[in-house]
């Protein structure tokens, strides 16, 4: 969430920067008047409280002196009623301001290319060698069904479309990747956690999923607690420290979390709905960092390298792109996408994102640090990154490591986890 005072004091530049997202933010022009009305109400309330306190003292003094308190008590009651009315007005005014700020996205970083969608993202560099096949490569669905390691038909019988049953070496490959990723990031100083998969409304708001993306997540409607299914480990992991204040010498705090994620994926169509590229339920390894504001972009660059290491060790060809302003996530100031080359698409496809939300999520979650320079509490910066999406990594391995006979060579780094060098 953006800071109200900052938005009001810098309104033209804030709107100009936000409109690089190719959206209309004219509604923010309401904020200066709302902020002024709020300020006036606060002053009136402060004055009335002072009058009410003075009146209460007079009541006490007259009562102690055994004088008639009828008129003074009547004045006190009038002041109390007026105060309650003003406090209700203030509550409504603050809710109006809150509603505006809660749907307003983060300010994009100045380094981002200006654009309308992912077509305007900027390729930064490529890594790894794209394989030249001596045969026509198959897509992961064909390969997996021939090997009987992914079962879409039975998953559909259980749950409907957008689900899969991993079986045999398919299940073992998924598990091996999770273990490999968790081990790798753990060695790099990320503390391993397994958070809850059922999440409350406050947690979903804190990371920016609500209210904007209500239609993209799963809500447990029989719950009295406004519970949601985990859409990404980013949500529960960040909320570990909601309403907390860090000591500065503890930063950065780094977590790696493995969870199953659940998303509606509304509006998905075309080739992406074939196979496991876009699922309602999928496994993901997520990286989270709570950083000092002064070095959060250095931490972001290091997190990118940490995510890249997974692809490098798996020897998968990939590229890094910088997201344009039009493709940038709601809560993020800057995002790098990792895209792996998929032979069936003959192009690079997203396998992970690494982002800096600056203090946007920290403000919503009220996560701060004590600044020793001035002894004041300041919002930390929060980073999140994929480390990686497990299902899409399975796709990349099946397609890039396929053999002409339909078998799959297991990447060398996974062989100790899987206990074999070939899937057949």
UniProtKB/Swiss-Prot annotation:
Superkingdom: Bacteria
Matching InterPro entries: aa-tRNA-synt_IIb, aa-tRNA-synth_II, aa-tRNA-synth_II/BPL/LPL, Ser-tRNA-ligase_type_1, Ser-tRNA-synth_1_N, SerRS_1_N_sf, SerRS_core, tRNA-bd_arm
Biological process, per Gene Ontology: selenocysteine biosynthetic process; seryl-tRNA aminoacylation
Broad class of where this protein is predominantly found: cytoplasm
Keywords: Aminoacyl-tRNA synthetase, ATP-binding, Cytoplasm, Ligase, Nucleotide-binding, Protein biosynthesis
Subcellular location: Cytoplasm
GO cellular component terms listed in the entry, alphabetical order: cytoplasm
Residues the record lists as binding ATP: 263-265, 350-353
HAMAP family: Ser_tRNA_synth_type1 (MF_00176)
PANTHER family to which the protein is assigned, alphabetical: SERINE--TRNA LIGASE (PTHR43697:SF1), SERYL-TRNA SYNTHETASE (PTHR43697)
NCBIfam families listed in its UniProt record: serS
Domain remark from Swiss-Prot or TrEMBL: Consists of two distinct domains, a catalytic core and a N-terminal extension that is involved in tRNA binding.
Role noted for this protein: Catalyzes the attachment of serine to tRNA(Ser). Is also able to aminoacylate tRNA(Sec) with serine, to form the misacylated tRNA L-seryl-tRNA(Sec), which will be further converted into selenocysteinyl-tRNA(Sec).
Self-association state and partner proteins as the record states: Homodimer. The tRNA molecule binds across the dimer.
Family: Belongs to the class-II aminoacyl-tRNA synthetase family. Type-1 seryl-tRNA synthetase subfamily.
Name used for this protein in its record: Serine--tRNA ligase
Organism: Onion yellows phytoplasma (strain OY-M)
Gene: serS
């Amino acid at each position: 969430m953006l800071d109200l005072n900052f938005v009001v004091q810098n309104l033209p530049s804030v709107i100009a920067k936000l409109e690089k997202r190719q959206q209309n933010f004219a509604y923010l022009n309401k904020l200066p008047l709302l902020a002024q009305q709020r300020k006036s109400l606060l002053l009136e309330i402060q004055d009335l409280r002072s009058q009410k306190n003075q009146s209460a003292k007079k009541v006490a003094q007259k009562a102690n002196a055994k004088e008639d308190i009828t008129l003074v008590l009547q004045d006190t009651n009038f002041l109390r009623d007026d105060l309650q009315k003003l406090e209700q007005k203030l509550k409504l005014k603050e809710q109006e301001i809150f509603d505006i700020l809660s749907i307003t996205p983060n300010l994009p970083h100045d380094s981002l290319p200006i654009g309308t969608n992912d077509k305007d993202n900027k390729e930064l560099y490529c890594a790894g060698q794209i394989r030249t096949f001596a045969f026509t490569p198959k897509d992961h669905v064909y390969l997996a069904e021939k090997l009987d390691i992914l079962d879409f038909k039975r998953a559909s019988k259980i749950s409907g479309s957008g689900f899969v049953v991993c079986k045999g070496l398919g299940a073992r490959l998924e598990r091996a990747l999770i273990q490999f990723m968790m081990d790798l990031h753990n060695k790099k100083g990320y503390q391993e956690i397994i958070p809850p998969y059922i999440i409350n409304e406050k947690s979903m708001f804190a990371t920016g999923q609500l209210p904007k993306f209500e239609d993209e997540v799963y809500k447990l409607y029989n719950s009295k607690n406004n519970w949601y299914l985990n859409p990404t480990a980013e949500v529960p992991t960040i909320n570990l420290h909601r309403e907390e204040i860090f000591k500065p010498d503890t930063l950065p705090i780094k977590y790696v979390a493995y969870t199953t994620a659940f998303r509606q994926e509304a509006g998905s169509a075309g080739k992406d709905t074939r196979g496991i590229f876009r699922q309602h339920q999928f496994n993901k390894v997520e990286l989270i960092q709570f950083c000092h504001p002064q070095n959060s972009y250095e931490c972001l660059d290091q997190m990118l390298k940490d995510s890249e290491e997974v692809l490098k060790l798996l020897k998968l060809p990939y590229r890094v792109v910088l997201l344009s302003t039009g493709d940038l996530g709601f809560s993020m100031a800057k995002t790098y996408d990792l895209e792996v080359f998929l032979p069936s698409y003959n192009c690079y496809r997203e396998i992970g994102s690494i982002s800096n939300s600056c203090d946007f999520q920290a403000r919503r979650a009220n996560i701060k640090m004590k600044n020793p320079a001035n002894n004041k509490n300041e919002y930390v910066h929060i980073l999140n990154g994929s480390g990686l999406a497990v299902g899409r990594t399975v796709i990349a391995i099946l397609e890039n490591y396929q053999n002409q006979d339909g078998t799959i060579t297991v990447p060398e780094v996974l062989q100790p986890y899987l206990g074999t060098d070939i899937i057949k």
